[in-house]
Regions:
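Cytosolic nucleotide-utilizing catalytic cores of signal-transduction proteins
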Residues: 2-186
Length: 186
């Protein structure tokens, strides 16, 4: 870091941009054009679908500010290259040695978001909540829990009206009041 003349203890955010569907090699160039300061911001090609952006930020940068940066990257790639992306944001690292952890967190954010929040294209590691905890559980423990909660043939024992109500509940994004309006329940 000393030989390259950049600060080791500056706050930085890691954004992992994953291209969904088709990938474009020009993604790195487009992102590098968005962050031209090569001494503070770094754009790294990880593999054919992933690009990491390490952005130096100020001390007062909020999670909302990070989401705005991610949104601008998403919009630029969508408009210029017609690429659909999912962006994971790691926690802010205050030192160079913490960047690897932040990168892993950005990866985890994408993986957890793929399972628990498929609608979002920008996922912040700090906002994963209980999904992060569940994601880290061993598969066998999840299978045991599911087999205890959902007994064999339990869905078969439900009548048609109950199944209809459950389907409406999911169609209305788990919104009880909207479901009751649709079912005329008062």
């Amino acid at each position: 870091a000393k030989e390259l003349h950049f600060a080791t203890d500056a706050p930085r955010a890691v954004f992992l941009i994953r291209q969904v569907g088709h990938s474009d090699v020009a993604t790195v160039d487009v992102l590098a054009g968005m962050f031209p300061d090569k001494m503070q911001d770094f754009v790294l090609s990880i593999n054919e679908s992933d690009v990491a952006v390490i952005k130096q930020i100020t001390g007062g940068t909020t999670p909302e500010d990070l989401e705005k940066i991610a949104k601008s990257m998403e919009d630029t790639l969508k408009n210029e290259l017609r690429i659909k992306t999912v962006i994971g944001i790691g926690t802010v690292s205050d030192h160079l040695r913490e960047l690897a952890d932040s990168y892993k967190e950005a990866q985890t954010a994408i993986d957890v978001g793929k399972v628990f929040d498929t609608e979002k294209s920008i996922i912040d590691y700090e906002n994963l909540g209980i999904g992060r905890l569940i994601y880290q559980l061993p598969t066998t423990l999840c299978e045991i829990f599911l087999s205890e909660v959902f007994k064999k043939n339990s869905i078969d024992s439900l009548d048609q009206e109950t199944l209809f109500t459950i389907n409406k509940f999911f169609e209305n994004n788990l919104n009880v009041s909207e479901t009751s309006r649709k079912l005329f329940v008062h």
